[in-house]
Amino acid sequence: MMKKILLLGVLLLSVALVAPAQRADNYPPQNKNVVIDHTNLPIVWLDVDGVMILRDERITARMKIIHNGDGQVNYADTVAHPGQRIDYEGYVALRYRGNSSFNHSRKPYSFRPLDKPLEEGGTKQKVKLLGMGKDNNWALLAPYSDQTMVRDLLARHMARPWMEFTPDGRYCELYLDGIYYGVYILVEVVSKGKHRLNLDDPGESGDDLTGGYIMEVDRYENPVYVSSYHPVTNSGASISNRYIYFQYKSPDYEDMTAAQIQYIQSRIRAMENTFASTNYQDPATGYRQYIDVMNFIDYQLAQELAHNVDAYRLSGKFFKRRDSEDPRFKMVLWDMDLTYGIPYYHGGWQTDQWSYRLNDTLFIKGDNYLIPFWWYKLNNDPAYTAQLKERWAQYRRSNIQPERIMAVIDSLSGVLTADGAIDRNSPAWPRWGGYVWPNNYIPQNYADAISFLKQWITERIAWMDEQLGFDPNARELGDVNGDGNINIADVTLLIRYILSGNATDVWVDSSDCDQDGNVNIADVTALISFVLGGSWP
């Protein structure tokens, strides 16, 4: 016990020693002379009247957002261009946010809209921002290492159709105290709310006590719950001098009662005890009673497609509803900027490694934060890996197709280039052709950065296809027109093919729906049954 206490003390001290101090000038850009005339992005003004922004304490700021609508022009000179749409104007409680992202020259922010200044007793209020649902907890992300500025939104976009909740975000351009700070992403955060995670606050007993909670696997930041189990190597051996830490995100630890703290700790402990047991794979009594398996699979595939070297061990947010609604833990995607081939460390630039198998590398490199042992256990359960492969095949027939991903990248990057946002951001924060931590590849310009991202994703998908047994040239049974979906359009095309024998764009191998070696009216019957929710013969 004393050894654990000493270790935690050393970790806390090391964090304090490396954390950079706030600066009175609020970290202005290298070039403070960049200005906006007009832009297709919303314009966000923050004014703190020269007051130093802090990391751990909020200050009062004034915020104004001009947003004339998607695709419309926004003008910075509101006198010359009166009558523009004000998306929000009022006070906010502002502070810096982030861990590794806070170490960059350009800082991300957390803010909460207020009814009046903090000095006058202001309280947070829920507002709708840039078309995103009302809430009182927001962030301004500052993409810096990712010079394409699309990775975070790209990961969210691809995960959103599969996961219950994935925070949304919008590009904007930011002024702070009249100085242009560049392109930011105004985002929802992982929090409780009608338009976020619709969770009840936990009560004191019974079913009310069992939800809702938001926790996070992350760094040691007191207070934390320390797992009873150490992380493991790729062969399953315990790494006894490393620990897994769970942070309390909602409710905040100081707002929780003793009963609530004890409950969520005991629930995590019960889950981990089950994973550590010899019969953890049992469908009825094993880990499946504690986690939403498909949600964990979706989370894993999102992290692996991006080859996030921080995955599972940092920003590992998960939540739990009340038992009467759903007793299982579910993961939420967050912090996806150092992904898709950026990091030089831990093999993050490579396309042919699994992130969930990084513990050996992390330990050798002296990293203090390793992946919880349950991800090792999951990926050594044949039933889980079979579901993982099936889900990957679903992804590949849906939105995780190279051409669709390239279209999303083109759409996101197009927003940034259409009216000069990149051309303003780049001189404010000059980086092209120079090293920016932790990039393994050094892009020479924006087109080069986008080209590298596309090539990396293409290679990553090909490798994952090979590892997970998916043949991109094969067509799913019933997908007669080969569009990746099975619906009434396939029924129509199959009927036309049977009647005429020469319909174009027919995938004959996918048309033998009853798998008897012939394509005839019986296949139409089988296909209609499947489209209506049945199963194949």
Residue ranges with predicted function:
Residues 470-537:
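Cellulosome-associated attachment modules in secreted, modular CAZymes
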Residues 22-150:
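Conserved NTP-binding catalytic cores of kinases and kinase-like/nucleotidyltransferase enzymes
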Residues 108-112, 136-142, 149, 157, ...:
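Structural recognition of the beta-strand scaffold that forms the well-ordered cores
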Residues 63-79, 150-164, 262, 266-276:
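Zn2+-dependent metallopeptidase catalytic core
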Residues 33, 40-42, 52-54, 58-59, ...:
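Middle-to-C-terminal accessory/interaction subdomains
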Residues 17-21:
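Sec/Tat signal peptide C-region and signal peptidase I cleavage site
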Residues 112-118, 126-143, 163-167, 179-301, ...:
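Internal "kinase-insert"/substrate-recognition segments embedded within catalytic cores
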Residues 5-15:
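Sec-dependent N-terminal signal peptides
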